């Protein structure tokens, strides 16, 4: 501690941490039959070589609970479901690769209490969204596809089966890091770039999601804000365009894009 309140001199503090060769804690799913007052046997051997294993909750009807297993080395990631009836474990997702799974920004969304689930994967070489059959664990369809990157899912409209997300890299000749706000039906149809203007976009929706504000900019374009209608993505009104003329009058120059 460099500047303790109790004295002028630093205080040496010790921190105990695991080092190569040390025994590491292992977290495993456990199931108890409350009425019979006994622990049910689970086959947990496949999940012992772990970076982490997290329990992720029970199904609404209590038929099962789920967990996520990240194998040490980050080349396998499993979403498992444990049956409350007999303790059997089945894999809803078993993501495997020879390279690396970017586990930090994984995305999973359970539909209809696990009958389907949305899962982001890079299995085709690009980060895209997949619809998984929650009964069989098989891929029902690849929802998004192409030589571009799905950055983040923002909202899933379960009633209309539409997903809203940010993506980048699909507009040729544009900065591949520009974020665009998009939507697509869960059957893979109806892809719409809701913010087609050349720039990096940030959107904010109204409470009922009928309208949204879109603020976009580039290094060589001061921020522009618009009000848009969600249904047809039409521009309802231009709200503001940043004026940098005073800066330019003082000799400031916009960055040169290259």
Regions found by a protein language model. Name each.
Residues 64-68, 116-120, 163-167, 212-215:
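Residue position within the beta-strands of beta-propeller blades
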Residues 71, 123-124, 169, 218:
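Residue-level signature of beta-propeller blades and closely related beta-rich strand-turn architectures
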Residues 17, 25-34:
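Blade/loop signatures of beta-propeller domains
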Residues 1-24, 70-74, 165-177:
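Short, conserved, GDST-rich strand-edge loop motifs in beta-rich repeat architectures
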Residues 109-114, 157-166:
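Repeat-blade elements of multi-bladed beta-propeller folds
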Residues 1, 22-28, 39-43, 52-57, ...:
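Non-catalytic accessory segments flanking enzyme active sites
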Residues 34-37, 84-87, 134-136, 185-189, ...:
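Short loop/turn segments that connect beta-strands within beta-propeller blades
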